[in-house]
């Protein structure tokens, strides 16, 4: 899978861009604030219909603009498809080969991407929201039904929270029952993904670290009895919700569910968050992204497009080398941003193209 053409109109500070990326490594360099990350954001949006910065539609449109347009030509197995996303303040519209997509499930999968940002390096030590965001992105790529399950859960959660905010108990049982069923679907899909990448994670971590340290990744439900969950999943969630009922009324929000769950990262049987060194934590996240890439490659029998946002400044020389060696072995397209070409060992990257970005313009 390759992105062979990209066109942007009024997307953030990228006014009129036409780009023909190389099929392997594409390096975009320039000072901060010139548009490098915006370029990666446009590719991510072309694949997922979302901004990885959680930006509103209006923020994606250039100043004084009415709309933004992102178009790309994707090639897979010698078949080309034209993808377009129109961004207006009131919403987005997507087309594939000029056909308007009325179901998002028909749109997704035409371009698969994996994103690696400095934010994710802090995923081990950071808050649970970072880990949930990573997990949702990773699960969704190979499990398109996850998006529907998650959106259903989010709608039910919103309605239940609305009752809690006004301390209205009438009807709360109905929403609680629906919440539990929707939550179980989300949890099931999240856990299934973690089961699939567990062995991959260990293999890549061993390759990076060069030692026999063991790593674990586990799903942790907030406030739920894990032993009861195995026997009676719905009963375990209902019990947890009952136990937190007073807290929910006091706070006016749902205290139990996938929106509060977390991931446990283990190293040699202990919490990586508490006991791993900074180097070990970075190796863990790097192995996690490698496992994600390998998983997607197996799902679609084609590697995803990789977006590396200023990662060369976040990884030390050895981990940079490990990442690049991993990428060189795979027939995948990579987009790299950096403030300086000195941060990227260009000579070691075969089939590379470099682009300078200045004030929203791309200079070859």
UniProtKB/Swiss-Prot annotation:
InterPro entries noted in UniProt: DNA-binding_RecF, P-loop_NTPase, RecF/RecN/SMC_N, RecF_2
Xref: Pfam families: SMC_N
Swiss-Prot/TrEMBL GO biological process terms: DNA replication; DNA synthesis involved in DNA repair; double-strand break repair; SOS response
GO terms assigned for molecular function: ATP binding; single-stranded DNA binding
Domain of life: Bacteria
Coiled-coil regions, chain positions: none
Amino acids binding ATP: 30-37
Role noted for this protein: The RecF protein is involved in DNA metabolism; it is required for DNA replication and normal SOS inducibility. RecF binds preferentially to single-stranded, linear DNA. It also seems to bind ATP.
HAMAP family to which the protein is assigned, alphabetical: RecF (MF_00365)
PANTHER family with a match to the protein in the record: DNA REPLICATION AND REPAIR PROTEIN RECF
Name of this protein: DNA replication and repair protein RecF
Organism: Citrifermentans bemidjiense (strain ATCC BAA-1014 / DSM 16622 / JCM 12645 / Bem) (Geobacter bemidjiensis)
